[in-house]
Amino acid sequence: MSDTEAPVEVQEDFEVVEEFTPVVLATPIPEEVQQAQTEIKLFNKWSFEEVEVKDASLVDYVQVRQPIFVAHTAGRYANKRFRKAQCPIIERLTNSLMMNGRNNGKKLKAVRIIKHTLDIINVLTDQNPIQVVVDAITNTGPREDTTRVGGGGAARRQAVDVSPLRRVNQAIALLTIGAREAAFRNIKTIAETLAEELINAAKGSSTSYAIKKKDELERVAKSNR
């Protein structure tokens, strides 16, 4: 194109788009529905809202104030002393199921067992299973234990008070040991035996393995005061 030629004007027809106006529903969404959509529930079933720790000394060590969807937070609770008190209590119970040698590291299997256990508890008791678990742990933590004092031939047993964190640790261990032993060579699954153990412990029944062990520890401590 030479310098004398004028540039050709190109006319384009642009379609005018009307401004979008959002549609407003005539009936607003109820607050209950909005809360249900935003609330975090364990396995999308069980709410943490009304769960209560009835023992004042264990409130800071039974973690139910941080809701979770699944019992696996991948947290590094072992890096610092006492940090495991911040671990959700359902996850601590799940981790305790992996303590037997052949179950080490099988977290997905343990999570499935806990999910099935909570369903069984809800069917049998018609209660929030998280509350049943918290009550069971509260009832099975021994308040008194014994320790060795002295050395050599003069060693003896001395009764001592148990710290809140150790009470929770022992309660979780006793509950899972009782469920594991009950499921061994039994037609019942470990989810069923764990559900029975938790329900009996929450009631304070002497049929619970954990309750019997707790009473035995406290009885021995009482005789060594």
UniProtKB/Swiss-Prot annotation:
Q: Has keyword Thylakoid? A: no
PTM sites of type Phosphothreonine? T27
Q: Please list the coiled coil stretches.
A: none
| Alphabetized SUPFAM superfamilies for the sequence | Ribosomal protein S7
Task: Report the superkingdom from the record.
Answer: Eukaryota
Which is a Pfam family this sequence falls into? Ribosomal_S7
- Biological processes per GO annotation: cytoplasmic translation; maturation of SSU-rRNA; regulation of translational fidelity; ribosomal small subunit assembly; ribosomal subunit export from nucleus; translation
Recorded family membership: Belongs to the universal ribosomal protein uS7 family.
Report the function annotation for this chain: Component of the ribosome, a large ribonucleoprotein complex responsible for the synthesis of proteins in the cell. The small ribosomal subunit (SSU) binds messenger RNAs (mRNAs) and translates the encoded message by selecting cognate aminoacyl-transfer RNA (tRNA) molecules. The large subunit (LSU) contains the ribosomal catalytic site termed the peptidyl transferase center (PTC), which catalyzes the formation of peptide bonds, thereby polymerizing the amino acids delivered by tRNAs into a polypeptide chain.
What name is this protein filed under?
Small ribosomal subunit protein uS7
- Organism, scientific name: Saccharomyces cerevisiae (strain ATCC 204508 / S288c)
* Gene transcribed to yield this protein: RPS5
